[in-house]
Amino acid sequence: MERRELFSFLSSSLKGAGNEKEIIIRPPYYSDITAFDTECQNCDGKCATLCQEQIIIIGEDKTPRLSFSSSGCTYCDDCAIACEPDVLRIEDRRLIDVGVRINESTCMSWSGVMCFSCKDPCLEDAIEFKAMFMPTIDQEKCTSCGFCISRCPSTAIDIKVMSS
């Protein structure tokens, strides 16, 4: 078992499996959230196919959603360009509608372990460390791209959908 897998296993056993409601995070190029349910039903999912980071997945309801389990969003515009039903449009570019925060009770750094896994991939330098072991996310700098989420070995970064 690799180190990252070990930490993920340990932290998931602390959180309690199956207790969380599914969080649906939409790609960042929409203006009308209801259009996902009405316009995506007959689409072939090109937004997911062309996503460079492969974070767009098509759910059972045939609508696109983001999964930060392996990577984050670069805001490259490819999903909006590929969207034939025009649910995603470049002119509607916005930040991903989630709030991101570090859960101090499951964060390895907050427990005294030297870990910078969340800070390293952050292109906006939004993760700041108070002293050496207390990371926080500067919400003014954070673009909610999700790169920190996939890199955290203890899954200590929580996501909250801001709008629906």
Feature roles, as predicted:
Residues 1-164:
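Non-ligating segments of multi-cofactor redox enzymes
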